[in-house]
Amino acid sequence: MRAINNKKKLLEICKNNDIVFLAIFGSFVKGDFTEDSDIDLLARFSKPKSLLDLVRIERVLSEVLGRKTDLLTEASISPYLRERIKNEMEVVYERAG
């Protein structure tokens, strides 16, 4: 996995948006990332989020990471892909407790 720049800012985003778990998966983790690739992220929240909240958080993450992100929640993952994603993902942030 490539190093994620600005981890301090990323942790701040997680804390300010009720993210208790954030993982990266897909081409970024597998090493076949290109200039056109987005960053696939899986998030778990401590409080329910509206679609507008998710879009706003995705936009903020894209700005910090310097490229388009695709933010998914566990509930939004296809059951057919869930196991593969969980096997390849790398945890970026997990709130203790």
Q: Residue locations for each model-derived region?
A:
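Catalytic core of pol beta-like nucleotidyltransferases
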Residues: 1-23, 29-35, 46-97
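Conserved G/P- and acidic residue-centered "switch" motifs that form tight phosphate/ATP-binding loops
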Residues: 26, 40
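Short hydrophobic/aromatic beta-strand micro-patches
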Residues: 42-44
